[in-house]
Design a protein with these regions (language model features):
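Metallocofactor- and cofactor-centric catalytic cores in central/energy metabolism, strongly enriched
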Residues: 2-163, 167
């Protein structure tokens, strides 16, 4: 069974895991888990229907990390840095996590406490992309219907919260 309606996890001949997309073209570029931005090789661009949808130059992940980190360093406000990183995550999760791993000590206070409290308070002003599944007392009577809208087929982890910090954004 595929892990998602949009991709599955496969292994190559060396046993290395990779994502095999079931979508191509414009839709592929809109899925943060699959979008590699300018890191798609020329062959991948042809096979995945990305010709003409990306700038022609292929950049490595290292080049992408250097570019976004330079931009990140120009931002002064912790909240603006948080927003910048979340927007990156909404576009390209591979690049986001690679960058954060390289700069974890510097970025963790931006992505989590103390900055996340301010981000939650400003949530309605900075919300851009839905992440995960939300159930509340307002939709509990339609929970089965709502679960059908989740694009994942093989869910192995669920994080539940009492909304203690999140109540500020409600």
């Amino acid at each position: 069974m595929p892990i998602s309606r949009y991709y599955d996890v496969k292994r190559d001949e060396k046993g290395e895991r990779y994502l095999e997309p079931y979508v191509t073209g414009f839709l592929l570029l809109r899925l943060p888990l699959l979008n590699k931005g300018t890191a798609f090789t020329e062959e991948e661009r042809r096979l995945l229907g990305l010709e003409g949808l990306l700038p022609p130059h292929v950049h490595t992940l290292e080049e992408q990390k250097e570019r976004v980190y330079r931009r990140y360093r120009l931002i002064q406000s912790p909240l603006e840095k948080h927003i910048y990183l979340r927007h990156l995550q909404d576009r390209n999760e591979v690049l986001f996590y690679a960058l954060v791993v390289d700069h974890l000590e510097e970025m963790l206070p931006i992505l989590y406490t103390p900055t996340v409290g301010e981000a939650v308070r400003e949530f309605s002003h900075i919300y851009r992309y839905p992440r995960g599944f939300t159930a509340s007392t307002k939709n509990i009577d339609r929970i089965d219907e709502a679960l059908q809208n989740v694009p994942l087929e093989d869910v192995r982890l669920i994080v539940a919260t009492n909304r203690d910090l999140g109540q500020e954004a409600a």
